[in-house]
Amino acid sequence: MANKKLLVVGARGIVGRSTIKHFSKLKGWDLVGLSRSASDFDSEIEWINVDLQSSADCRNKLKSLNDVSHICYSAVFEKENLTSGWAQSDHAEINLSMLRNVIESMDKNSSKLEHITLMQGTKAYGGHLGPFKMPARETDSRSMGPNFYYDQMDWLSEFQKTKQWNWTILRPQLVFGVAARSPLNIIAAIGTYASISRELDIPLRFPGGVERIGEATDARLIARAVEWVGHNKIAANQIYNVTNGDVYIWHHIWPRVAELFGMEHGVPQPMSLVRLMPENALLWGRITKKYSLKNFSLSDLVPSWRFADYMFGYGQRPNPHHMSNIKIRKHGFSDCIDTEEMVLELLREMQELRILPR
């Protein structure tokens, strides 16, 4: 029997990288990574550099992929101002065109196409606008304003109606994983902030707001969910929330992070990382040389500290976002991960990869 072939779109991102790592260990799968830039991690898969915003580039670069059976789409366009860009109409338009360019090309090229997994998140419930009904369920009504999740879902479901393949939408919470140059990588933000604090000989102080309960999703869990939805008929044309299965409070995780880096844990001190951290770019360069780390600049690892401020709740009132996992569990996917242990595991992995100092 011929192998299945998975096309990972957004292959250098947190979800893409974890999906490639997971499927590389499975028998019967060939992989293709799709990204604007060359791979920045070790893998032996086929890799295609393509501008997803260009329909012509997608047609030309993807025309040889005539045997793709599955697609995991996790690519996203973000503006420099990040959170404020989420409510702008051109942000939605660009993200829709990227998806459309890939799917239209692959639908034309590959007669073997079976399934497409599309990544979303809590913006589907208006999480970027403020509090929403909790726990959020897949059947909840939409929120107001431009939202590329809605545009992508509407287009994909309409386009698929006359096709033989099907789709599944996964909605994780805050995604944790290992990747460079991702504007939404909170692990890199935690690790570089801790490393710089240690180098300055100051305690590790939580820089965000008051205590609040949060949820997270490990990118490794998402990769396993991508595998599950891809071969279970019950998941055809369905939307699923997917989280680790527990909750966390940043203030409880911080002492464990301090212990991992061998430093003192200090009392919380609210501060804007957007304002303070870029000033440490030269110091980070000295840290990379001192500990013989891979040559990533601070802006490579954390392109946007605005996301860290947002997720740590700096200058915000507590705004918990909780989603129900009941649907995906009832349908047969019951995997889970301990969030506090996950944070430490991923930081250790970045240390082992010589991205962060030990």
Where are the regions that the model predicts?
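N-terminal Rossmann NAD(P)H-binding glycine-rich loop of SDR-like oxidoreductase domains
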Residues: 3-28
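Active-site beta-alpha turn of Rossmann-fold NAD(P)-dependent dehydrogenases/reductases
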Residues: 10, 75, 117-120, 171-173, ...
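Conserved glycine-rich Rossmann-like NAD(P)H-binding loop of the short-chain dehydrogenase/reductase
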Residues: 27-40
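NAD(P)H-binding glycine-rich loop region in Rossmannoid oxidoreductase-like domains
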Residues: 39-97, 101
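Short-chain dehydrogenase/reductase
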Residues: 51, 88-96, 134-135, 142-154, ...
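Conserved Rossmann-fold NAD(P)-dependent oxidoreductase catalytic core, especially the SDR/UDP-sugar
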Residues: 70-75, 83-148
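NAD(P)-dependent short-chain dehydrogenase/reductase
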Residues: 158, 162-224, 257
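Mid/C-terminal beta-alpha module of Rossmann-like enzyme folds, strongest
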Residues: 223-312, 316, 324-326, 330, ...
